[in-house]
């Protein structure tokens, strides 16, 4: 059985992280998002969020969960799995 390999450069959620920040009223700055994630117990910096949004950094599963929680969106929406999912 052949193993399928997927080539993913960067990550699948960068654009959605940026959009999720912009949807907040007022919009969340990268610093604000990093602070929220730090308060949940995970180390995060503005630089990490910037690199995620620019597709320059991979995102681990635990980070995806924390990003979704901090942004108030579903994992499906954040990952672009379900285009119709409510954020």
Language model features: what each stretch is:
Residues 25-52:
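Short alpha-helical DNA-recognition segment
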């Amino acid at each position: 059985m052949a193993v399928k390999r997927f080539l993913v450069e960067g990550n699948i959620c960068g654009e959605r992280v940026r959009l999720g920040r912009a949807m907040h009223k007022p919009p969340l700055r990268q610093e604000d998002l990093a602070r929220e994630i730090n308060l949940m117990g995970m180390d995060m910096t503005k630089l990490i969020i910037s690199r995620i949004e620019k597709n320059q950094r991979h995102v681990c599963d635990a980070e995806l969960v924390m990003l979704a929680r901090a942004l108030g969106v579903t994992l499906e929406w954040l990952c672009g799995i379900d285009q119709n999912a409510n954020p």
